[in-house]
């Protein structure tokens, strides 16, 4: 397992990465950690809870469980030789470790070539066959992603099955897989099954999840194949194509059989400071989520973040919204809800308000989450400002997580007290709570596949096209802040 601990560092600084690194080393299975590269992900467009510098990266490269630099997301900065980006990449290269990529733009012209020339060696943000082909042809490893809400393997694998490119240059991966997916459908075995269903030979798909990955990260002398001198990490399966796993061995020890652990996983004691990270100036009220209209307006044309099902990128949308008592209202009939980013690292009391579409909520409801890539403030989406305030205040009280309210009542809660991002409960318990959350959202009209994952990315200002940050509404295509109302820009 490869982990990029960016979330922990965004909230808990370099110390957060070290805590996750140390916990990873204590596990009976291999969990390798990449040092975060972009904290914040887009300087000038957001404020995170911390900053990672090239000196931080250089120090982390000396830690025993660090295998490289994770997800270089500031792709304009790489192409422009930004000193922070260049410094972190250089420190990684000097250490002889791998530079992970994150090029989320559809532009495969000069910006892409400049990014690749800057040093990133892999990328998982492609969605099209030509994205995968372009990365491989430029010497990168194309990582084909299947997460809980991102379905990018089927289209990109055609670079192998139709274009005939060498499968040894491709890696299968997950990204943002929630507990329900992991418990009920699996982790990498789910991705491999899916790749086989798209036409890959079983052995090829397995290779793309094992040996290809190990070689890319310089770990092939330890893992990646069942050969002498490597760790005795292997699976016993009864059906290769379906990847039905009967037993799991790690380091020669049987850890799981018939879908159940046969050894206890060691618990890690996080310090109390890691559980006190939702810092808000005060409880919020409905007024904090109000959007004042321009003076004298009866209606406005607002920019709207358009969620795209099963895809990480959003679209730029617009909607004509009514003004009532001087405030711009959301519109369930147009599928336009309120969205707010609540600052939660420095207790500034800041709330940024905008609008989002695609969730199809009905009635009076709101979802709040402190998992909000990549700076992990609090994101609240709702059709009703009172419910938005209730949801935000509930997360403040429990120390973070995700909660859903409808008609003034709490309908589902998943507590994530560690940095507001992680739970220390067993996976089965978290999965049960996550299932209840998704069901509560469905009862309020949200039929979007894995809608919570979409919610968690709405503030990720390095993935096109329109996002929200503590600085305002961000046009990622042009990397600039834009007005909420179209009239404010056009006059």
Residue ranges and their predicted role:
Residues 14-19, 44-45:
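Metal-dependent catalytic neighborhoods of phosphoester/phosphodiester hydrolases
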Residues 175:
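Active-site glycine-centered loops adjacent to acidic/histidine catalytic or metal-binding residues
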Residues 183-199, 203-491:
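Active-site microenvironment of metallo-dependent hydrolases
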Residues 1-8, 12:
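Single conserved hydrophobic/aromatic residue that forms the stacking wall/gate
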Residues 19, 51-71, 77-144, 151-172, ...:
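Histidine/acidic residue-rich metal-binding segments in metalloenzymes
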Residues 27-46:
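Metal-cofactor-binding active-site regions of metalloenzymes
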Residues 9-10, 35-41, 148-150, 212-213:
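Acidic, glycine-rich active-site loops and adjacent beta-strand->loop/helix elements
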Residues 33, 99, 172, 381-384:
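Residue-level marker for buried hydrophobic side chains located in beta-strands
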